[in-house]
Amino acid sequence: MTEITKLDPDVAIDLAYDIFLEMAPEHLDPADILLFNLQFEERGGVEFVETADDWEMEIGVLIDPEEYAEVWIGLVNEQDEMDDIFAKFLISHREEDREFHVVWKK
């Protein structure tokens, strides 16, 4: 089995944020987009997190957490915790065949 070259966290964050900006208008409520735009400079966060192993419930496909990076985009509270998540991204580490899945705020 070949070794997977993992995405650099900064690259994963940039990819997720670019996809978020492109797709958010189609997937988020207009009020959430307005809230995000008004609050992002002060409270916004884009975090590279440990890849969860429960993505199968979200996307209907079993994944190997070692093969994907997970990034959350949202707003943080006074305790510096992300309490309003607008999107969770799952991005494959495979550069030649990049896949991504997004769970949008409902």
Swiss-Prot record:
Gene3D superfamilies: dsDNA mimic, putative. It comes from the Bacteria. Signal peptide: none annotated. It holds the Pfam family DUF440. InterPro entries: dsDNA_mimic_put (IPR007376), Put_dsDNA_mimic_sf (IPR036763). May act as a double-stranded DNA (dsDNA) mimic. Probably regulates the activity of a dsDNA-binding protein. This is Putative double-stranded DNA mimic protein PM0536. Belongs to the putative dsDNA mimic protein family.
